[in-house]
Amino acid sequence: MNKIKRALAVGAHPDDVEFFMSGTLMRLGQVGYELHILTIANGSCGSMDLGPEEIARVRRREAQAAAQSIGATYHEGLANDMEIFFERPLLAKVTAVIREVVPEILLVHSPQDYMEDHQ
């Protein structure tokens, strides 16, 4: 019996996985991994022109389309932008996704990243 190999990429915002991890995910998909993408924040602060709810919807659709284009399952944002705190409620949500996916490989931001949300 073959065990399904899974990879989970976790990004702080919509577009982070696409910019920082999509090449690695695509390669993992080519060698048989089931791909998953989790975005912590929903992208609600991602525009100077659109309101928070509208830009969050736009960025969610874009992230879903990007995930679909590489054959990945997209797990939606768990918090609003600017609300990524290292606290139990958010950690519980992230843990729930990790337990659901049970990844062999977990891709995350570099700890030396330029942006606080990425740490």
Put a short name on every predicted segment.
Residues 1-102:
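Active-site rim/loop-helix segments in enzyme catalytic domains that contact anionic ligands
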Residues 94-119:
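Active-site adenylate/phosphate-handling loop in enzymes that bind or generate adenylated species
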